[in-house]
């Protein structure tokens, strides 16, 4: 698949029918389906990696760093916070959000390819994450389940499943009426979502994160690399901690 074909695939709206596809939809870092961990999201802790000599504790912080990569003093200060942050949720809420007005004006031009590059570096640089991704069945459709998220990009990076949402909401009301506490209700919802109800409904959205993960997984399996647009990233002049990154190297997993 060439770079343009990959971009078209990446931004295409999808409708994954859970009744006919082997959907591995992740929402939380502790999700488990068919005995396999779904700790695949950017926010998940514990999968640190180096990106051209700079260590990040999680891929969310590395991704956000690209939005503030003009090399200005303000951007350097933000990046220093991101490098030491070990919590992707905190980075998004407490580091990115307050400085949203300072992000690069051309961010949307290269952010998808930057995410692909970041996740690929995570695959190359963290063996535990790499093996986790490779453990997902070959016929699985990896999906970011953002059904209960309200953000404008919920169905860009992820998907929504309205039928499953209704089932889970009805279950919550039923269990609440029985006097079950909030934590117990959530556990029961997760159990059904990842088990008996995993084949319910249709996941709709672009699912960029799921597609990027599947693309990286396939590259690892084939001993190749994803169709990263290195020319676009090089042209973006991405600076990290005072160093402009270069994108002319081809690296495979060890």
Residue ranges of predicted features:
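Charged, low-complexity intrinsically disordered segments
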Residues: 1-254
């Amino acid at each position: 698949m060439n770079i343009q074909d990959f971009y078209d695939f990446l931004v295409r709206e999808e409708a994954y029918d859970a009744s006919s596809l082997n959907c591995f939809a992740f929402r939380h870092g502790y999700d488990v389906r068919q005995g396999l961990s779904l700790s695949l999201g950017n926010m998940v802790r514990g999968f640190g990696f180096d990106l051209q000599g700079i260590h990040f504790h999680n891929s969310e912080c590395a991704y956000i760093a690209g939005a503030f990569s003009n090399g200005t003093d303000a951007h350097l200060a933000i990046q220093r916070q991101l490098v030491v942050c070990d919590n992707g949720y905190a980075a998004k809420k407490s580091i990115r959000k307050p400085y949203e007005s300072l992000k690069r004006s051309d961010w949307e031009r290269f952010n998808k390819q930057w995410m692909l590059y970041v996740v690929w570096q995570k695959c190359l640089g963290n063996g535990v994450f790499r093996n986790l991704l490779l453990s997902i069945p070959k016929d699985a459709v990896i999906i970011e389940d953002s059904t209960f998220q309200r953000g404008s990009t919920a169905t860009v990076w992820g998907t929504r499943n309205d039928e499953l949402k209704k089932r889970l909401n009805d279950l919550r009301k039923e269990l609440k009426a029985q006097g079950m506490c909030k934590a117990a209700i959530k556990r029961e919802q997760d159990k059904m979502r990842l088990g008996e109800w995993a084949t319910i409904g249709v996941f709709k959205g672009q699912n960029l994160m799921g597609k990027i993960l599947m693309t990286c997984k396939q590259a690892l399996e084939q001993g190749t690399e994803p169709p990263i647009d290195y020319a676009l990233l090089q042209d973006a002049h991405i600076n990290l901690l005072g160093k402009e990154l270069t994108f002319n190297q081809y690296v495979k997993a060890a």
